[in-house]
Amino acid sequence: MVEIVGHRAFKARYPENTLLAFEKAYAAGADVIETDLQMTSDGMVVVNHDSDTGRMWDKNLVIGESTWEEVKRLRCKEDGSLAMMTLKEILTWAVCHPGAKLMLDIKFTNEKIIMIKTFVIMLEVKNDLKFWQERITWGLWLLDWYDFGIETGVLKDFKVIVISLSLDIASQFVKRSLTLNDPHYKLFGISVHFVSSWTSQFRLRLLPVLMKNDIKVYLWTVNKPIDFKYLCELPIHGAITDDPIKARKLCDGHTVAKKPTAEKKFVAPSLASVDGLRFHAFIKVYNILCTLLYSKWVHIKLCGWSIAYVIFLFLRTIHFL
C-alpha cells in the first residue's frame, strides 16, 4: 500500500501548515504529515513553507530577518484565528495524537543550527529519543546537511530522506549512504518530483540501485488521477499529496507495483493522446527546469523579480508544481 503523506498537512482544503490543517490531515488518516521548518533571527524554529510571509500571512516579513516577537503577531489571511506555529507546538500536538508521524522539510535557506535546535526541541517536548525516531522523518536538500547531521549525531537512527528536484543530487545522497555503510545513518529514501519518475534516468538507472539497497521513493506533489496511475505502476513507497482523502481513494483504485516486472510494467502514454502530450511535454519541462534552476544567473533579480521566480509562477500555473 502506498504511504499517503499530507503535503503541508492538508493544503488542498485548509490553510497550509496551520493547526487546522494538521487536525484535518490526522482525521483524514494521512500516514504521515509533511511540514516545513524555518528559523527566525532570534532562533525560534517555526512552521512555514516560504522564507517570507506575504503569501500566507497578513504582513510580509522575511522570517530569517525577523524576531519571533514580530512573527507571532501575524495572522492567516484566509482565517484570522490562525497564527504561525512553532516547531515545539506541532511536536506537542504530535505527542497528543497517537500514531501521528511527521516529515520535516528543513529548508536549506536556514543555518544548519536549525537541525540541532530541532533535535533539542524534540527532547524538550518528550524526553524519549526512541519515540521521535519512530515518528519523525528528516527531509534534507543538500549533501553537506546530511554530513552535518552525521557529524553531530542528530540523525542517528532517524529516517532521513533527500528532497530534490534533481535526480543527480538524490544520487549523491544515495552514494554517500552506500559509501558510509553505517546502519545508524542509512538513507531511508528519496523524495523527488513526480515527473522525474517518468524519466529513463530514474526508471533504468537510479531505481534498480534504490531497490537493491532498500531505499524508498516518495513523489511530490501528486494530485491528478492520471499521475496516481503512473505512480502505482512503479514501486513507489509514498505519495506526497495536497489532499490525503482523495489520494487514498485514487491509490486504492490501482494495483501497486512491488517491483518492476514483465506483468506490471510502466508504460508511457502515446503522443497521440492528451495524456501523452502532457506526459512528454512535462518531461521536457522537467529536463529544462533542472538545467536552469541550478544555474546561478537565473537567481539574479531584475526589478525585484528573478527568472527563477518567474519560472516558478509559470510552473504553478500549468500545475507542474
Swiss-Prot record:
Gene: PGC1
Main location: mitochondrion
Miscellaneous field: Present with 3270 molecules/cell in log phase SD medium.
SUPFAM superfamilies recorded: PLC-like phosphodiesterases
GO molecular function: phosphatidylglycerol phospholipase C activity
Protein purpose: Phosphatidylglycerol phospholipase required for the removal of excess phosphatidylglycerol (PG) via a phospholipase C-type degradation mechanism.
Compartments in which it is found: Mitochondrion membrane; Lipid droplet
Mitochondrion in keyword set: yes
UniProt GO cellular component terms: lipid droplet; mitochondrial membrane; mitochondrion
EC number: 3.1.4.-
InterPro entries, sorted: GDPD-Related, GP_PDE_dom, PLC-like_Pdiesterase_TIM-brl
Keywords from the named record: Hydrolase, Lipid droplet, Lipid metabolism, Membrane, Mitochondrion, Transmembrane, Transmembrane helix
A GO BP entry: phosphatidylglycerol catabolic process
Membrane topology: Single-pass type IV membrane protein
Cysteine pairings via disulfide bonds: none
Catalyzed reactions: a 1,2-diacyl-sn-glycero-3-phospho-(1'-sn-glycerol) + H2O = sn-glycerol 3-phosphate + a 1,2-diacyl-sn-glycerol + H(+)
Name the record gives this protein: Phosphatidylglycerol phospholipase C
Species of provenance: Saccharomyces cerevisiae (strain ATCC 204508 / S288c)
Effect of a null allele: Leads to the accumulation of phosphatidyl glycerol.
